[in-house]
Amino acid sequence: MAHVITRINAREILDSRGNPTVEVDLETNLGIFRAAVPSGASTGIYEALELRDNDKSRYLGKGVQKAIKNINEIIAPKLIGMNCTEQKKIDNLMVEELDGSKNEWGWSKSKLGANAILAISMAVCRAGAAPNKVSLYKYLAQLAGKKSDQMVLPVPCLNVINGGSHAGNKLSFQEFMIVPVGAPSFKEALRYGAEVYHTLKSEIKKKYGIDATNVGDEGGFAPNILNANEALDLLVTAIKSAGYEGKVKIAMDVAASEFYNSENKTYDLDFKTPNNDKSLVKTGAQLVDLYIDLVKKYPIVSIEDPFDQDDWENYAKLTAAIGKDVQIVGDDLLVTNPTRITKALEKNACNALLLKVNQIGSITEAIEACLLSQKNNWGVMVSHRSGETEDVFIADLVVALRTGQIKTGAPCRSERNAKYNQLLRIEESLGNNAVFAGEKFRLQLN
């Protein structure tokens, strides 16, 4: 029996920052399947287009009624009657035929909006799992051609100190994460992370006052820290005090495009101070040296977006210098785009992909980006966005793709913990068929 799509309805809901986003209900004979898409704060210029209304009289221009209209009036009529198990066919129809917009890096989704296409793509995945009588993670594994007998549970990279565009402090680097690689299971890794998080909260309260323990968009703290060393010292102290020295490592997301000056090709580490004295302006080469020094001094295992999204040269220099011991992750550099990944492979620019489904705009293309990266022995980290919803799709996706690592915020705020809690459920349901990535989070666990 064919399980066809009988109805699609899109609506505008609020994300975790109070901004509108797209949610879709997709109906088949087996029920109603729902999906909601996230949105980012520090977005790469090469990401697929997130369609906003730009009507300043409504939600300050951030409404998504255009995307909703595109779903209900353009996409839905074409998908009614299609088999919900034909994921690739449906995604290709939306991306290539109904939208059809392109730029130098591929399909740009600038006509219908990546937020419109992705919401349906995710809902179709959920609907497609139902007739197969399998969980979403097992169905996604099938779509990716991955084995689904033994599944890999990821190491959580928990964002506990915020800077950059995510925070009102002076800190230029955007995220400082704790990575519990020494835990025996996901459940224990989450416990290690939560305990370090609460220990860190006490340390921050003691040193910076109670106001400094307010949390940011992703649940992390944003005390008035001035530089990376200060943040890293805090983390090392918290890890040690919690009793997890050696078992919990550190990852950073620098988001360097946010403080890059393209005119003189420099990086301003004091970019949040207006009219500063330029004493913290660095060249790409100086920034390479800074990262090398930090890696020598602290237990850092991963650095994301260490340079601007077009600074291929310094990416390659850093990867050559420390890539054997440290994961160099491309986010704004790659934007989950297979064409950008191919260029990075040619230039040896980095050795890991940050996988964000809404950067590329369809599940088929996201899987393609992951498989291309894994084929070339890169690490892959599945990621949330700073504007999230209660949708837990990425928790199933990370298990399905066997990437061994996920970042979806601090162990705080329900839209973040929703993903971690779903991973707890998946690990429990798999029983002995669950393998925790642990120290091997960068390796191919295929």
Curated annotation (Swiss-Prot):
Keywords: Acetylation, Cell membrane, Cytoplasm, Cytoskeleton, Glycolysis, Isopeptide bond, Lyase, Magnesium, Membrane, Metal-binding, Nucleus, Phosphoprotein, Ubl conjugation, Vacuole. A motif (Pentapeptide insert) lies at residues 104-108. A motif (DKSLVK motif) lies at residues 277-282. Glycolytic enzyme that catalyzes the conversion of 2-phosphoglycerate to phosphoenolpyruvate. In addition to glycolysis, involved in various processes such as parasite development and invasion. Plays an essential role during ookinete invasion of the mosquito vector midgut by mediating the interaction of the ookinete with the midgut epithelium and, further, by binding to mammalian host plasminogen in the blood meal, whose conversion to active plasmin promotes the invasion process. There is a cross-link at K138 (Glycyl lysine isopeptide (Lys-Gly) (interchain with G-Cter in ubiquitin)). Homodimer. Forms a complex at least composed of DegP, ENO and HSP70. Interacts with G-actin. Interacts (via the DKSLVK motif) with mammalian host PLG/plasminogen (present in the mosquito blood meal); the interaction occurs at the ookinete cell surface and is required for ookinete invasion of the mosquito midgut. Interacts with A.gambiae EBP; depending on the Plasmodium species, the interaction is either involved in ookinete invasion of the mosquito midgut (P.berghei) or is dispensable (P.falciparum). The lineage of its organism: Eukaryota, Sar, Alveolata, Apicomplexa, Aconoidasida. Pathway: Carbohydrate degradation; glycolysis; pyruvate from D-glyceraldehyde 3-phosphate: step 4/5. Mg(2+) 1 binds at S42. This is Enolase. It is an enzyme of class 4 (lyase). Its cofactor is Mg(2+). Belongs to the enolase family. HAMAP family: Enolase. One of its GO terms (cellular component) is cytosol. It is found in: Cytoplasm; Nucleus; Cytoplasm, Cytoskeleton; Cell surface. It is a peripheral membrane protein. The active site is at E218, K356. The modification Phosphothreonine is found at T339. Binds 2 Mg(2+) ions per subunit. Mg(2+) is required for catalysis and for stabilizing the dimer. Unlike for mammalian and yeast enolases, Mg(2+) is dispensable to form an active closed conformation. Inhibited by high levels of Mg(2+). The modification Phosphoserine is found at S42.
